[in-house]
């Protein structure tokens, strides 16, 4: 497998999960202050990941949650975004102009900006009110955030069990990648010379 680094995979998962108490404290503070809705905002890969999470949230949470593509949000706006909104974002580089502009738009509307930005000195990180900085996948970062909101709303009774089981997530992800690699190699060997 190209660029496959087991230690990096484990470390990324561990770093995100290690932020549990800080994420919980930030979410609790937001909940105590009160909010009306949550906006998951992304572009490209972060949007795709947030879209996948929305599939789960729609069926398991009564919170008012919106999924917005950063470029569309800038161009079209959203009348539901305001002072009682929470905008949740993730970014690796923190340099994507559409994300930075979307966050600025959210701030202009008075929204609380809650985000994970790997590069803490980036333009996006500087615009983010509640900032967490660690490596790792966007899905897990969004998941731990939204599960913390669900816990505060009494919508996720298995919260502690999730974290117990998440301790083995790094190993599980490594095993999945190894198994997938084996199967793709077998497929390529079997069908690599097939005519189209």
Predicted regions and their residues:
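N-terminal amphipathic/basic leader segments beginning at the initiator methionine
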Residues: 1-17
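Hydrophobic packing residues in well-ordered alpha-helices of helical domains and bundles
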Residues: 6-9, 23, 162
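A short N-terminal beta->alpha junction/helix N-cap motif
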Residues: 14, 18, 41-44
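A short, well-structured juxtamembrane/interface segment
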Residues: 15-34, 176-193
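Glycine-rich phosphate-binding loops that contact phosphosugars or nucleotide phosphates
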Residues: 31-170
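Oxyanion-binding "anion nests"
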Residues: 196
């Amino acid at each position: 497998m190209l660029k496959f680094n087991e230690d990096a995979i484990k470390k990324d998962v561990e770093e995100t999960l290690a932020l549990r108490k800080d994420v919980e404290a930030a979410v609790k503070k937001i909940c105590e202050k009160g909010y009306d809705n949550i906006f998951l905002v992304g572009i490209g890969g972060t949007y795709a990941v947030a879209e996948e999470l929305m599939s789960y949230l729609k069926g398991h949470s009564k919170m008012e949650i919106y999924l917005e593509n950063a470029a569309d949000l800038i161009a079209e706006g959203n009348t539901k975004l305001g002072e009682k909104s929470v905008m949740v974002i993730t970014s690796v580089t923190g340099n994507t102009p559409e994300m930075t502009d979307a966050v600025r738009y959210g701030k202009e509307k008075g929204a609380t900006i809650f985000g994970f930005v790997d590069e803490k000195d980036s333009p996006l990180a500087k615009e983010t009110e509640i900032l967490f900085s660690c490596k790792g996948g966007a899905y897990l970062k969004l998941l731990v955030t939204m599960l913390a909101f669900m816990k505060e709303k009494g919508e996720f009774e298995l919260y502690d069990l999730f974290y117990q089981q998440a301790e083995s997530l790094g190993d599980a992800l490594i095993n999945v990648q190894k198994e997938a690699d084996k199967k793709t190699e077998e497929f390529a060997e079997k069908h690599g010379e097939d005519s189209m």
